[in-house]
């Protein structure tokens, strides 16, 4: 299905007035007015404006986890787990393709947090799954250098009241905070960290899985020993 933008006035009248236009050019303009819709888990991109941008260097408490990018509208869970595993152990360099298969992610059901937890545990990680978390819980984990996977409502195809929305669940990683903001690694956003004002984050911090409400959900994945911890300052030689 295609969503159509408003096209020039030339196409809002009767096309028989424009028989002189070559058919190839006409088709080009028609398709130029069409864009594919983006739905689901965090691929509905919105253009950033100067007012929306902030500098990571100005955030006093920020964990620099690897930036990962989901390749489809149902693999946000895959991408956040990929980031977290590599963050804790740089030898756990799993490709998205591998994790999609291991986690059995699919377009209908997305990625199950329970499957994510089971996979992490099978690799020797400690996993703590919580609901009913508080903002202070998030802050305390971040203060100790531990990012938190959260489920929020985000990237809806149309304007919605996220406090009442349960249909646009999205995985992100809470990695930082300041007085009025929470910062994230959001796999729907290429190359940059993201943020939400605290009040808005709290309104969005919920989801539903197979009929079960997940309010203030958080998943904490840790290594008992962090010998190969990810360091964004490292630059590797190509082999």
Residue positions per predicted region:
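Extracytoplasmic/secreted envelope proteins and their assembly/folding machinery
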Residues: 77-85, 96-100, 113-117, 135, ...
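Bacterial N-terminal signal peptides that target proteins for export
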Residues: 4-26
């Amino acid at each position: 299905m295609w969503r159509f933008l408003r096209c020039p006035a030339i196409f809002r009248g009767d096309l028989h007035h424009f028989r002189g236009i070559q058919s190839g050019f006409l088709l080009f303009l028609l398709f130029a007015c069409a864009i594919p819709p983006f739905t689901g888990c965090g691929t509905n991109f919105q253009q950033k404006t100067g007012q929306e941008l902030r500098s990571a260097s100005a955030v006093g408490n920020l964990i620099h986890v690897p930036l990962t990018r989901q390749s489809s509208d149902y693999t946000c869970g895959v991408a956040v787990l990929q980031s977290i595993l590599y963050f804790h152990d740089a030898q756990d360099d799993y490709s998205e393709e591998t994790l999609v298969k291991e986690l059995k992610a699919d377009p209908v059901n997305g990625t199950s947090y329970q499957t994510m937890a089971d996979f992490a545990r099978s690799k020797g990680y400690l996993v703590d799954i919580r609901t009913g978390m508080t903002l202070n819980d998030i802050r305390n984990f971040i203060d100790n250098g531990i990012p938190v996977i959260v489920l929020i409502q985000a990237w809806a195809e149309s304007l919605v009241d996220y406090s009442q929305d349960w249909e646009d669940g999205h995985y992100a990683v809470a990695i930082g905070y300041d007085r009025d903001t929470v910062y994230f690694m959001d796999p729907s956003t290429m190359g940059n960290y993201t943020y939400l004002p605290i009040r808005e984050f709290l309104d969005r911090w919920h989801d539903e899985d197979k009929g079960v409400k997940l309010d203030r959900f958080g998943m904490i994945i840790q290594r008992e020993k962090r010998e190969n911890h990810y360091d964004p300052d490292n630059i590797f030689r190509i082999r």
